[in-house]
Regions:
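Short beta-strand His + acidic residue motifs that chelate non-heme Fe in jelly-roll/DSBH
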Residues: 72, 142-149
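Non-heme Fe(II)-dependent double-stranded beta-helix
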Residues: 1-55, 61-63, 101
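Double-stranded beta-helix
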Residues: 79-143
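A short hydrophobic beta-strand segment most commonly corresponding to one strand
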Residues: 72-74, 136, 151-156
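Short, structured patches in soluble enzyme cores that scaffold and shape functional sites
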Residues: 41, 57, 74-78, 90
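Acidic, His- and aromatic-enriched active-site or binding-groove loops in soluble protein domains
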Residues: 57-73
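Extracellular structured ligand-interaction cores
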Residues: 67-71, 83, 123-125, 155
Length: 156
């Protein structure tokens, strides 16, 4: 998986998308009129080796206080249960921040990924068509699982 940050500074089309009025309207309806861009990223997941993103809260990385940020995830390709759509734990944003540990995969620590243990029986998949978006609070527990898809996806 490849993560590219600060896309709005590198690409005019991406910048125009991030500052598109309908997205700003969604953000202001949720957090009020003082909207600021805190962080952006694009995730590129090559087929079959795209990698998983373990359960985490975005604020586990950001550590902002107060934790009053949202993420708007825009699907650049169709994302469903066969190719790494987002999974969330509904209502988890109402809980206190979780302690995150470094993610592990095949007995290796992944220093750039955080992870938290959750009750997966309550998780919900959020499939998105290309061009659609989902919004979640920075304390919402979410993940993307690794799949054996044969198509390269650029979901976020």
């Amino acid at each position: 998986m490849l993560q590219v940050s600060e896309m709005w500074q590198k690409n005019d089309i991406f910048r125009d998308l991030l500052f598109h009025q309908p997205l700003l309207d969604v953000a202001t309806s949720l957090i009020g009129p003082n909207v600021q861009l805190f962080h952006d990223q694009a995730l590129y997941k090559p087929s079959k080796i795209g990698g998983a993103v373990p359960w985490h809260q975005d604020n586990g990385y950001w550590r902002c206080q107060p934790a009053e940020l949202i993420s708007i995830c825009i699907a650049l390709d169709d994302a469903d249960t066969t190719n790494s759509c987002m999974n969330v734990l509904p209502g988890s944003h109402l809980e206190k921040p979780h302690n995150h540990s470094r993610a592990k995969q095949e007995q290796q620590e992944l220093p750039s990924l955080l992870s938290v243990e959750v009750d997966e029986s309550q998780s919900v998949s959020i499939p998105l068509k290309s061009g659609y978006a989902m919004v979640h609070h920075c304390l919402t527990l979410h993940r993307q699982i690794q799949t054996g898809q044969t198509k390269t996806v650029e979901p976020w």
